[in-house]
């Protein structure tokens, strides 16, 4: 992939043994599953959202406002920090594109999906807003993310070939997801 991502990785040595990346769009359940995987493996959990929120706070913007601005420098700062964390310690990272950012530095790449209605319900509950408002925010954000990632990184969010595990959790609870991922972890890392 010819993009800035390669520049982020050049001349970097991986000092970690296990890095798990969990990708998905807004409301897909990345953070929730990442906490479970972190618990299973006993690893630190990092969320690219935390870096994003801290940048929004520094600029006195809501995360929705910053997402609308979505300056290239913000995306690159988040991705650089994500990569630095993954290279320096065993961890679980969740973001929309962490598997793309880390590429082969990720030892297990998971993609979560859920239909728009379920994602809107989750975001509405988390943000304490109406489901309709959440849906509009998600649709706008998904469209913007897809365009940005294509422009900045040549990433096609529809391309799922890089993932080791795809989970549609529209109708799956967290315990069911945990079981699926635990089996994949046991197979990949001989971890029980």
Where in this protein do the model-derived segments appear?
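Walker A/P-loop
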Residues: 31
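P-loop (Walker A) phosphate-binding loop of NTP-binding proteins
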Residues: 25
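ATP-binding Walker
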Residues: 28
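Hydrophobic anchor at the beta1->P-loop junction of P-loop NTPases
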Residues: 22
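Extreme N-terminal, non-catalytic leader segments
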Residues: 1-17
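Small-molecule kinase domains that catalyze NTP-dependent phosphoryl transfer to phosphate-bearing small molecules
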Residues: 131-180
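ATP-dependent small-molecule kinase phosphotransfer cores
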Residues: 40, 44-102, 116-118, 125-136, ...
